[in-house]
């Protein structure tokens, strides 16, 4: 069936995609003809050779509507097959889809099924891959039918043994052959039903290694039994030849040809095949034929997967040729290069410059770029307005850039948002929509407040522009992606558009007050008078003054006097006066300014937060624009600059240094006299110098004037920090050597005084290590994000309420005594599952099934509640994705989540994006063996991959009382349970014991310090505890680095890691022991068996690392495009898997709309009923999919 015959709609309207083994008949059916010659194109005429790899008769004409010999040219002969050359007159595009085939003279095995791990062919035949290899590559005979002889079926015979057997029993007494033919016969006579029964019987009695192998064999046998595949199809009789335009040959300038590697590989196969045919016709001696067959087998192996077995076939310059498998694999393969990410039309890129005059939702687009991007729209408009008569002349107008084109362009872009994207796009805020404004020059102008989200600066960064074309796309861009609507960060719900640098500095400068400046103590009758006085220079901007304020209340005009500064008045002008910073219910505060404090970065964040909660995005973005304008203006007027003279070295520095020198001398003396050890001396010296550095820094900070520009920059949070000021004007302090150990000679100088050579040299260690770390970290973090996206990409909010009755109990997360995450943070935006009651009075604070906003959550914590049961993603019952109630609040909008939101991707981005901020280093604890605890990024990876951690803690499997015992050789901890049974644990030296003698511990508690293996927690405490452990451990790493991530993102990923059940006993079900099954499928199967009164299957929740979990997904397309492409496809093909296309990746690959947001089935199939007779409310008939 060819494309032309298919109605167009069908191509994009399929429910699922199935993969399977191709039978020889199927391959011949696909093919348009046999490729018989290895020739490609004629070197003189440059036309394809007949019957060759580029033959026009098989694959279609090279030029549109023109046959090979030239008898038929032009469209009018469409569909005619030329009687001279046999080429069909049609479009040359068919050369991208028509296939050919090669009839092999001898069958060969398909390397994927013979060489993959585990070898599928080996399993189904119950032969080891090594013996199989001997047969396939003509090293041994295999007995096909022993008949009456004492030989065994499938027994291997070497050349010598074979000849001896022939002499002994005679030529006809038994059947033994070699090569793929023999294997094909063995495969063809397998009775799958019978074999399946036998294996199931064997499974009941076998144990250990044997059981594992039986299960593996059964898995392969069942795959073949349940699919329509036949085992003998793993041996190839016919090879498909892919269309020539997918393995092109192009002429280079020098007249030479460049060709795809596949052509070389096909040529080798055809050459060897033809030679083999000839040899068989001639009746050549067996040994020659056998050699040729082996070479054909190797040629086919190289074509399918070069380098999988033996040395790869190389091209010029010893480069291995790219085989069909390599075309799919890796970052440059078909999946990741062309299917998941494509280059698109209507896009451009350019350097970005700052546009402080823009509104929050605007961006500046260079004129010539805009004209090129909106060309078709401009052309259409020109024709409509009558400036051009037809589309051709309007195209000419645009290309010649006539003056009237610009007015039309203005009109076209006025309501047409564009998308701006900066690579690397680490989270969804890396692509936002803006209303374009035409600008001169060639640079894109960007609003300064969106820089944080893009992580952009103006030192030469580039950005890409994309144009949403359809009306729907424009609407989505405007409502969902407009920069003014994306004020909150999806990862933690805090504002991402907080003003930075100059804007903070200006606001800080405005809200400062100063004693004894011009105009202090003056009283003004209204704010306008203050502004007049300030503008005429009568008062200073920081002067403390009094002003009479008036406002209207209940229709009456009331007034009152407040004390403030002109700066604060100006700043408050841009802020709504009811954000809740001032308690307005108190009459004294009636006229008080809303922002009556010093504005720093932190406070600005609070202002934006409150404004967003109260007024929403639009109002907030206007406020931000006002703050931006004021900030820039007054930081310029304030003329806050930085110079060497601003760095004042504290007078007490020299005294502090000499004091420390004396103290260190004392410590040295004690060491020399043997009072303290080398380690102790080192520790004390380091401690002394650390203290001194701290003292110098404090002296410096006390010394600085409040109006010192450097102090202002650091204090306001505009730029720099206390530690940087310390280095500029205090002393640099202690540095580490390349191994991470601290050098005990501190750097005494500050940058202001200048470093000497030794000091400078010591400084370089840290700097270099920092650079190396950053480079490594970026790659690691990127790879972590990729795995996270892959594991959680199909988690979409698919229903309103899954009806789950189980909750997840949360309390604050602590590390030692330090609270890492408060209860309020964990409750905000969640649903309660039961009544939350006050522990003292027993009154209900929050009824069951109530959505808790920040205020409610805070109220719960204030009432002294310690633990709360909430709806959580962990306990969600939705089979695919999650439900809105278990998920709770959408962090990016601070409202309840909508159905169709792709929360999986957002979760992965929220965890991955801050990855680069986490450290790489392992903390060394004073050289104690086995106590290196991993932190930062490697720790996060360790947790998500569910690996056995470094610095493993020993945990107890039973609850009981502790008894410590120390011998010369080792330390032992005994745990005596309630029955008096003693379980002992050996503790290696160097581990620190956490428990004390006689203390009571529960199962799963740590005996020594370190990280616990999550698999142990799962085994001892169960799935609930392990989820909790993973969540709080990842949170600890991020929080210690000052990165806030909301729990729900981690919950989404951890849930994906614990979705599978490992089957123990299969009972009366079809499930095989040892296999992984989805939790919901497992329950479904058991429910069916239960109704029939059979024996249910048993199994335990398995904890998979994110890589494993991503590969264990139902969708083979998603798994194959992630990692281990060949393995995934081999497996899927044998099982005849069908991909239900539920996730995002699968749909991107096949080019459908993703099933999230407006792409969900329920929105795609909306029909408008025009029948007015029906009820008016039910105008839109939403088809629930």
UniProtKB/Swiss-Prot annotation:
Keyword Metal-binding in annotation: yes
Top-level lineage group: Bacteria
Positions bound to Zn(2+) 1: 67, 69, 82, 85
Enzyme class: transferase
Cross-referenced SMART domains: RPOLA_N
Keywords: DNA-directed RNA polymerase, Magnesium, Metal-binding, Nucleotidyltransferase, Transcription, Transferase, Zinc
GO MF terms held by the record: DNA binding; DNA-directed RNA polymerase activity; magnesium ion binding; zinc ion binding
Pfam families registered for this protein in UniProt: RNA_pol_Rpb1_1, RNA_pol_Rpb1_2, RNA_pol_Rpb1_3, RNA_pol_Rpb1_4, RNA_pol_Rpb1_5
Enzymatic reactions: RNA(n) + a ribonucleoside 5'-triphosphate = RNA(n+1) + diphosphate
Keyword match Metal-binding: yes
Cofactor section: Mg(2+); Zn(2+)
Disulfide bonds: none
GO cellular component, one term: DNA-directed RNA polymerase complex
GO biological process: DNA-templated transcription
Function: DNA-dependent RNA polymerase catalyzes the transcription of DNA into RNA using the four ribonucleoside triphosphates as substrates.
Protein family: Belongs to the RNA polymerase beta' chain family.
PANTHER family cross-referenced by the UniProt entry: DNA-DIRECTED RNA POLYMERASE (PTHR19376), DNA-DIRECTED RNA POLYMERASE SUBUNIT BETA (PTHR19376:SF54)
Protein name: DNA-directed RNA polymerase subunit beta'
Organism: Clostridium novyi (strain NT)
